[in-house]
């Protein structure tokens, strides 16, 4: 199965509590084994349960792709060591990079796949260059609709992408050219346009908030490349 509905302690905002790449997913601590098993089955990658800065909103703070995951500079040493040890045990050669910036909500501010990354205009050009080196892809600063929190209003994988309904046709064309995948507009969780906060997705599958409707699921499947 490449799509499932789930809640995290009755919250439909799954993207707030984790981030997924094609190699690994970081997930908040404290979820039951049944929910972890759904995530493993759909995303088809190992899960690393962690906190970031002693917080469960892992998906707000972390963002990345198959090359690296960026976390706040203020991540606790024990948390960073735990994530790195888990990666080493899994034999996954991937950077977990504490990034020094006045910004910390990288999950809200970075939208990335293995081809490119779109980052908030609140990052400086110097920071954009550093993120390009870390993530190993082309990085552009920009907005989607009137929103600088591009990670909140979008989700993108190596198969496709879904963004806020207020994205213009010109922005969609630009995003398709940047990420090298088809990009659609849509919502989740009964009309919520902040789709990045509503789901966990990679090239293998997508887990959406439990309030997501049937028509929304069809659009999500189409956007993320799961409809034949």
Swiss-Prot record:
User: What is an example of a GO molecular function annotated in this UniProt entry?
Assistant: translation initiation factor activity
Q: Cross-referenced Pfam families, in alphabetical order? A: eIF-6 (PF01912)
> Keywords assigned by UniProt?
Initiation factor, Protein biosynthesis
Give yes or no: UniProt keyword Ubl conjugation: no
- List the NCBIfam families hit by this protein, alphabetically: eIF-6, PRK04046.1-5
Function comment:
Binds to the 50S ribosomal subunit and prevents its association with the 30S ribosomal subunit to form the 70S initiation complex.
This protein's name: Translation initiation factor 6
Question: Where is the organism placed in the taxonomic lineage, from the top?
Answer: Archaea, Methanobacteriati, Methanobacteriota, Thermococci, Thermococcales
Gene behind the chain: eif6
């Amino acid at each position: 199965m490449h799509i499932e509905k789930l809640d995290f302690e009755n919250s439909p905002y799954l993207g707030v509590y984790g981030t997924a790449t094609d190699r690994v997913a970081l997930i908040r601590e404290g979820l039951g084994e049944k929910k972890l098993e759904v995530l493993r089955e759909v995303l088809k990658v190992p899960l690393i349960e962690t906190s970031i800065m002693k917080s469960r909103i892992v998906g707000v703070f972390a963002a990345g792709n198959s090359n690296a995951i960026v976390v706040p500079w203020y991540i606790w040493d024990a948390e960073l060591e735990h994530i790195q040890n888990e990666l080493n045990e899994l034999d996954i050669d991937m950077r977990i990079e504490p990034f020094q910036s006045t910004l910390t909500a990288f999950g809200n501010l970075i939208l990335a796949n293995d081809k490119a990354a779109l980052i908030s205009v609140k990052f400086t050009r110097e920071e954009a260059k550093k993120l390009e080196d870390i993530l190993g892809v082309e990085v552009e600063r920009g907005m989607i609709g009137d929103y600088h929190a591009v990670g909140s209003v979008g989700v993108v994988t190596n198969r496709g992408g879904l963004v806020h309904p207020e994205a213009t046709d010109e922005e969609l064309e630009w995003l398709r050219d940047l990420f090298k995948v088809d990009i659609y507009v849509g919502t989740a969780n009964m009309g919520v346009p902040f789709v990045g906060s509503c789901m966990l997705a990679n090239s293998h599958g997508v887990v959406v908030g439990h309030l997501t409707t049937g028509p929304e699921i069809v659009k999500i499947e189409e956007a993320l490349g799961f409809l034949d």
